[in-house]
Regions:
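Sec-dependent bacterial lipoprotein signal peptides
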Residues: 2-18
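Feature marking well-ordered beta-strand scaffolds used for ligand recognition
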Residues: 1-3, 20-256
Length: 256
């Protein structure tokens, strides 16, 4: 394996480790803490909620009981259809991004999640994060994503069994995203990183656009933004109240 790919693997591994959360409520897992603030990557294909590990492949949702970490116990496999990509836990539910839409599953029975609803959209790549009554979904077209739209969809999930489109914003080439209170971060691939003020969902305000970095996914946590890109692992400090973001450091990927 070429060294550049090993470097990318190591940085992705660091990113996954930083996603882990050990909050005491047992239902927080990788992508939310006790306050409901997202701290996990939006493009993850696995997550932990309490004593259960949930993974997705291209077609299925798989559940494992990991209360005995030496002997994980497979519990269930649920057919989700096709083009399954990402998984994000929030308030005892799983939000699963697919190329055809967003599936929502309930975790009342953690051994076998139950379907609640599906929000359908045009074919595209589809990571998702959730905060309060809204899901934030980026749609990206081209290449493996097949579609042509590049946009942010804000989905109203106040009626969890009837998710509806609230508003759409055009983007350049959106990949992963992260949300923390009034801050929304969107990675635009080779077109950089964006930070938005989302205090008014009807009128998002662009706070900053870092055009000089490659960004694939983000984790906002405790006013530190962790960004993974093809060129390295970046950190920024941010303040949602002051609408500020500042560069801290980079661990570069050395191309050999």
């Amino acid at each position: 394996i070429e060294n550049k790919y090993l470097n990318q693997f190591y940085i992705l591994l660091i990113f996954s480790i930083l996603s882990c959360d050990t909050s005491s409520d047992g239902l927080s897992g990788f992508s939310e803490n006790s306050s409901g603030t997202g701290i996990g990557g939006s493009m993850a294909r696995f997550t932990i909620v309490g004593d259960h590990l949930y993974t997705v492949d291209a077609y299925n949702l798989n559940t494992f009981d990991i209360s005995d970490q030496k002997q994980p116990d497979f519990k269930s496999e649920i057919d989700l259809g096709w083009g399954i990509e990402t998984i994000f836990p929030y308030e005892n539910r799983l939000f699963i991004g697919a190329q055809s839409g967003m599936h929502i599953y309930d975790l009342k029975n953690q051994d076998k999640p139950s379907w609640i609803s599906t929000y359908e959209h045009m074919t595209s790549c589809d990571p998702v994060v959730v905060q309060d009554n809204y899901a934030f979904v980026t749609l990206r077209g081209g290449n493996e994503c097949m579609g042509f739209n590049n946009q942010l969809d804000i989905i109203d999930i106040s009626k969890i069994d009837q998710p509806t489109l609230f508003k759409t914003y055009e983007m350049i080439q959106p990949h992963g995203l992260g949300v923390d209170n009034n801050c929304l971060f969107i990675t635009e691939g080779e077109f950089g990183l964006k930070m938005f003020d989302i205090s008014n969902l009807n009128n998002l305000k662009l706070i900053e656009h870092f055009k000089d970095i490659s960004s694939i996914d983000v984790i906002p946590f405790m006013n530190v933004l962790m960004v993974i890109g093809e060129d390295g692992f970046h950190q920024y400090s941010y303040d949602c109240e002051e609408a500020k973001i500042e560069y801290i450091s980079t661990i570069p990927i050395v191309k050999l």
